[in-house]
Amino acid sequence: LFYMLSGMVDTLMLSSVSDQAVGAVGTANTYIGVFIIMFGVISSGMVAVMSQNIGAGRPGIAYQARQLGLVFNALTGILISVVLAVFSGGILRAVSIAPALLESAETYLKIVGGASFLNALIPIFSSYLRVFGYTKHSLIGTVVGNVINIILNSVFLFVFHWGVMGVATATVISKAVNLIIVAAMGAVLIKAKQSPEREQPRRILAQIVKIGFPSAFETALYNVAMTFIVRFMNQMDTDGMNVTARSYAMQIA
């Protein structure tokens, strides 16, 4: 709910800048979502493996699963961040983005896409808190991040007049704060690292991928379908109003 609220707030605030800014951010987020699917494979599988081992009284193995998920998502996140930051313009041109949206979408994709590793790490630490029963603490990180996002959006848009760059910067800062909060809470509240149970890392990783891949595949199919829809809509006009209308509708629906 709070992630959806964040998107709605960004859209409403950007609408005060221009409709094309809304369309540019909506288009960029669609393609960021495709890359983020990779993180879901590990995080969803990691949650299942951690839950199984906590239920079986093996918190040490649950900690191992967290560590494996953290390393895998961190490496994948850094790689995707570099790709999106360096090749943002080429990616958007390859998907036939409307010329009127290109500059704003490229700016957003460079900044937010370049910080995709945050999207890779936040679910790892949030899930770690939730499976050990600290659901409220995970929520605190999300709420604080959203509040900071709203405040920074207001400052960057209406005081500094940074437009799309301001919204992108606010998004990255708020996610960084969210990550710091959930990571710190996990380190303070959960002592699973001290438990003696251990398992072969290769076996745990195989379990994570085996469970996570099917659950992420459904989301992957949906997101890929959305990218084709957005591409077709961009090809239908040069001013990007079709994808702008879609961005508004997606936030309202």
Feature map (PLM): residue ranges:
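Interfacial/gating helices of multi-pass transporter permease domains
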Residues: 14-33, 100-104, 164-165, 207-211, ...
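Cytoplasmic helix-loop-helix junction between adjacent transmembrane helices
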Residues: 97-105, 109, 116-143
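Alpha-helical transmembrane segments of multi-pass membrane transporters/permeases
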Residues: 73, 128-154, 165, 169-172
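Helix-loop interface residues and adjacent transmembrane-helix termini in multi-pass membrane transporters
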Residues: 5-8, 16-19, 53-56, 131-132, ...
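Hydrophobic transmembrane alpha-helices of multi-pass small-molecule transporters
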Residues: 34-37, 149-153, 179-183
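Short alpha-helical transmembrane segments in multi-pass integral membrane proteins
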Residues: 50-117, 159-213
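Transmembrane helical elements of multi-pass membrane transporters/channels
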Residues: 1-10, 111, 145, 174-178, ...
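Small-residue-rich hydrophobic transmembrane alpha-helices
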Residues: 11, 22-82, 119-138, 230, ...
